[in-house]
Amino acid sequence: MEKKKTYLYIYVCMAALLFVGAAISLSVGSAEIGIIGSIKLALSGIPGIGQFVDISAYSTMQRYIILQVRLPRVLLAALVGAGLSAAGGVFQVIFQNPLADPHILGVSSGAALGATIAILFGVQVSVLGIGTIGVCAFIGAILTIMLVYLIGGMKKGAKTIGILLTGTAISTLFSAVMSLLMSLNHDKIEQVYLWMMGSFSAAVWVKVCYVAICEMVCLCVCIVLSKYLNLMAMGEETAQSLGIETARIRRILILVVSVMVAACVSVSGVIGFVGLVIPHIVRFLLGDDYRRILPGAILGGGFFLMICDTLARTVTAPGELPVGVLTAIVGAPYLILLIKRKLA
């Protein structure tokens, strides 16, 4: 009972941090709007609640800044952080590798190649209000998932190592193709690199809804199957001896998580270390039960990336840093410490 209270307390603290972080993120920017004002303006956009919030003291421009610029960006950063963090936690169990992250199967490389083609060749396509780069990135990511499964994961007895090696090989191939394309189109290299380093500057409500729906479905599947992750973490032979169809569950989880990563990367670019760092911190706080780790990773990942994005758009204002740079600054030292601890 005491442990349950402790875990509940940690969840409440994490949720409170997420809320406070969101309020601060909404209030920070070139236009000065206080925290209370930002919260009021954000609440005014919620159907059924907005009519009870007095925002008469705020200008039309301030309402637009909060509701159409900052709020979609804050929510999108939180959603992508939650998705990448949960994906990293699942992959670390599936591949029995504490250094596994959401990009381990080459999904991000596929998305990056799709985005590169869209940028360099001026492809014009839009689906449900999502622009060319996002659509092409998502298509590239989905095609990568299909390739990985066709080559390394379709057979019933396919081993994890086969899927992993296939993903690594495809990722290397796509990276080489990207390098070739960029070497032939020098004038647009900067735009490609900026996308690859991650940014939420193009956040709009359509992207928020799209990612939210994808994540809701995928995370529900992951949470339902989280009890099997606990058994798989003990080793494949142990799980099989307990009657768990590890191959089937692994295939489902890899597919679902990869689709979630594809949705995240298509709207944000390639952002590293979120799915590597946060699951380990959450595991330290909540133990090794993945029924507790996944909700914690969702909250922790959302908070971490939201704060990193806030720093990215304010540290060098009116300019903006790629958010992937900040996540790498935080994540790389942690990765070094993790490797050092494993070697010891």
Task: Tell me what each language-model feature is.
Residues 1-344:
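Alpha-helical transmembrane segments in inner-membrane proteins
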